[in-house]
Amino acid sequence: DCGYTSTRDIFADSWEKQCRLPLFPLFHLSDLWCRILYGWSFAKASPLDAVHRCRLPMLFIHGDKDSVVPVEMVHRLYEAKIGDKELWILSGVDHGAAYLHDPQIYAQRVRTFVEHWFECPAILEQ
């Protein structure tokens, strides 16, 4: 739900469009700071690569009015996914609000996906 393609992409979108801050040098300085303090790089945080490598069935959910993660990103994630996948774009829904938009439909859609692709009776009985 609300998946983004890469740290760089989400920084570029939020900093340049919402905050009016340049991606360079802020992204590179932030990346350097994380490497020094935490020992990891933003380049290693790539949902796009992770989705491409994952062989499990995947359900992509996104609101078409997402103000934080552009809906175009879920289309790129969906295209990167090899194998079984499903894309659900909710009309008029903002960031993180897919469940709140209609909890019953959301739960049913996720349940249907899980029942179709996975065998997990303990979860499905609840």
Regions found by a protein language model. Give the residues of each.
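Catalytic histidine neighborhood in serine/cysteine hydrolases
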Residues: 75-98, 103, 109
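Short, well-ordered secondary-structure micro-motifs
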Residues: 9-12, 71-72, 100
